[in-house]
Structure formats: structure tokens, C-alpha cells
């Protein structure tokens, strides 16, 4: 599948990109190159191959959960403009 100049102009318009006349041939070639790679990858026979969640079979070692900071909720509530029942009150922005 190859893109024509009019296709690239339409894509640029939809993406709100301002391309000048000098950029169109270069962008068209770049997009066609990318689509060529996609076509090449789609042509590979992947029957019988299990999809991978991650290309490397490595697992992260997780540290144990530990409280590292003190609870400063009361201090933050004290400097907030408005609070009620432990909640921050903010102006309504969507009606």
C-alpha cells in the first residue's frame, strides 16, 4: 500500500499539521517507508508462535512495602482554602 500526495495532504489536514510544498515529497517517502515495514512484518508467518507480553523473560524484584513518610494529612488540611469532613472542597468546573 503506497500513499499518494493527496493522501498525505489529507492526513496532514486531519492531524492539523502545516506542511509546505517542499516537505510533502519527503513526508510521503517517509510514510511509505514506514508502511512498507508494516507490510513486511505482516507477511511473516506467525502460526504456532505464542505472543509475548514482554520480549525479555525478566522479572522485576519488588521491594517490600514500607511506610517511609509520616502522615501529614492534618498539616495539608490546615493550609487548604476549604475542607469538610477531611475532604478538600474545590470550585465546580463542569456543570
Swiss-Prot record:
Reactions it catalyzes: L-glutamyl-tRNA(Gln) + L-glutamine + ATP + H2O = L-glutaminyl-tRNA(Gln) + L-glutamate + ADP + phosphate + H(+); L-aspartyl-tRNA(Asn) + L-glutamine + ATP + H2O = L-asparaginyl-tRNA(Asn) + L-glutamate + ADP + phosphate + 2 H(+)
A Pfam short name: GatC
A single MF term (Gene Ontology): glutaminyl-tRNA synthase (glutamine-hydrolyzing) activity
Keywords carried by this UniProt record: ATP-binding, Ligase, Nucleotide-binding, Protein biosynthesis
Key word Protein biosynthesis present: yes
TM segment ranges: none
Documented EC number(s): 6.3.5.-
Keyword Protein biosynthesis attached: yes
GO biological process entries: glutaminyl-tRNAGln biosynthesis via transamidation; regulation of translational fidelity; translation
Family stated for the protein in its record: Belongs to the GatC family.
This protein's name: Aspartyl/glutamyl-tRNA(Asn/Gln) amidotransferase subunit C
UniProt organism field: Pseudomonas putida (strain W619)
Taxon lineage: Bacteria, Pseudomonadati, Pseudomonadota, Gammaproteobacteria, Pseudomonadales
Amino acid at each position: 500500500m503506497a500513499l499518494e500526495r493527496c493522501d498525505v495532504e489529507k492526513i496532514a489536514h486531519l492531524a492539523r499539521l502545516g506542511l509546505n510544498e517542499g516537505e510533502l515529497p519527503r513526508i510521503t517517502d517517509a510514510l511509505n517507508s514506514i508502511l512498507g515495514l508494516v507490510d513486511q512484518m505482516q507477511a511473516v508467518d506467525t502460526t504456532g508462535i505464542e505472543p509475548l507480553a514482554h520480549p525479555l523473560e525478566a522479572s522485576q524484584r519488588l521491594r517490600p512495602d514500607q511506610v517511609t513518610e509520616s502522615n501529614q494529612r492534618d498539616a495539608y488540611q490546615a493550609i487548604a482554602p476549604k475542607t469538610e469532613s477531611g475532604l478538600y472542597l474545590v470550585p465546580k468546573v463542569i456543570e
